[in-house]
Amino acid sequence: VTGGRGKRLTLLALCLSGTLLFGALGIWQLQRLAWKRDLIARVDARVNAPPVPVPPGVSWSTLDLDDAEYRRVRARGHFLHEKETLVDAVTEDGPGSWVITPLVTAEGTILVNRGFVPPELRDSALRAGGQPDGDVIVTGLLRRPEPGGRTLRANRPEDERWFSRDVAAIAAARGLEAVAPFFIDADASPVQGPAPRGGLTVVHFRNAHLSYALTWFALAGLCVAGLVLLVRPPARPEMAGRQA
């Protein structure tokens, strides 16, 4: 009897703990859902807003990228095409490369993702018509850097193999100084001849918090059902005999 009672108390403790734990996780996921919806709304407003001047160079060291990312910005300067970097990419056009080119501005140097090129246009000599000289105005989305590379594919600067837009590493490999801690995803712009295709930024945030919350609450409900079964008094033998 004592052993059975101890087992029952253990099951009660487990069900109670599960109810509290799974319920707390469900509430946490609802909070994350509210945060994600707010984030999506704020980013959507930034993406569709008129472009604003790029953050001044004096603010770069303290720039809050969470607040600045995906803002539409505008920068004026000239490109250093001889220092461009090709980063592996897969887009709606298939596999290819992002063309990352330093833009020298009055505020400092900003890396610009000018757009996508297919494998046959990796050589810059084949797209000379898309290499603007002199002062240009670039508009696009401010993006946070992508340090290190991708999962299982680390950047290898020594081999000119780039799998992510790692601002600091690209700047170091190209000998650039006073570089912004962000890059700009350039908008699409009409140019003559073969050129990088801009405006391919995909703004998408996975939002599965509601399904996660429902899962946790369902598990909490199962634990509650277990509690009910455990605390419900067992049927008396005479009552069971009568029913039989």
Locations of the language-model features?
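Surface-exposed, charge/polar-rich loops and edge strands
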Residues: 1-244
